[in-house]
């Protein structure tokens, strides 16, 4: 975020999520899935995993509030859940400004951020964190 102009800071993850939600809607609200649904197929939900805020300059409920939307699930750290219970607002915001998501992401890339590389790194790091958490859980039950 530090590489970005102030007006773009804190917007990358939210707009990547909005773009993912648009892609999700195209798949599960499209003709191809409608045919499957007619035969009993159930849609999936999008999972936003561990959406705690690490930057102290942002609201501690920024991600949980911005990612509330239909057919989504959000897992959050305990501290984020406590903060949301205390002062969060439960309202669907995921689709707010969703049509501008691609524009904002293009601006992010124009400022030197390679979103594909960033996504690969975040997926790798996130997967490693889940592996470590799972291993700790297994150690507890051994």
Kindly label every feature range from the protein language model.
Residues 1-79:
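Catalytic alpha/beta core domains of metabolic enzymes, predominantly
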Residues 89-142:
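Active-site or pore-adjacent capping/gating segments
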Residues 58-109:
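A C-terminal functional module that forms or caps the active site or interfaces directly
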């Amino acid at each position: 975020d530090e590489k970005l102009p102030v007006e773009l800071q804190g917007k990358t993850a939210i707009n990547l999520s909005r773009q993912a939600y648009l892609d999700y809607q195209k798949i599960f609200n499209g003709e191809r899935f409608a045919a499957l649904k007619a035969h009993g197929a159930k849609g999936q939900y999008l999972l936003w995993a561990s959406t705690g805020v690490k930057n102290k300059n942002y609201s501690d409920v920024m991600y949980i509030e911005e990612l509330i939307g239909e057919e989504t699930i959000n897992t959050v750290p305990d501290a984020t859940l406590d903060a949301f219970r205390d002062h969060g607002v439960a309202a669907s915001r995921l689709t707010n400004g969703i049509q501008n998501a691609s524009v904002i992401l293009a601006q992010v890339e124009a400022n030197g951020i390679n979103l594909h590389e960033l996504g690969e790194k975040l997926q790798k790091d996130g997967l490693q964190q889940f592996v470590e958490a799972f291993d700790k859980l297994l150690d507890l039950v051994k």
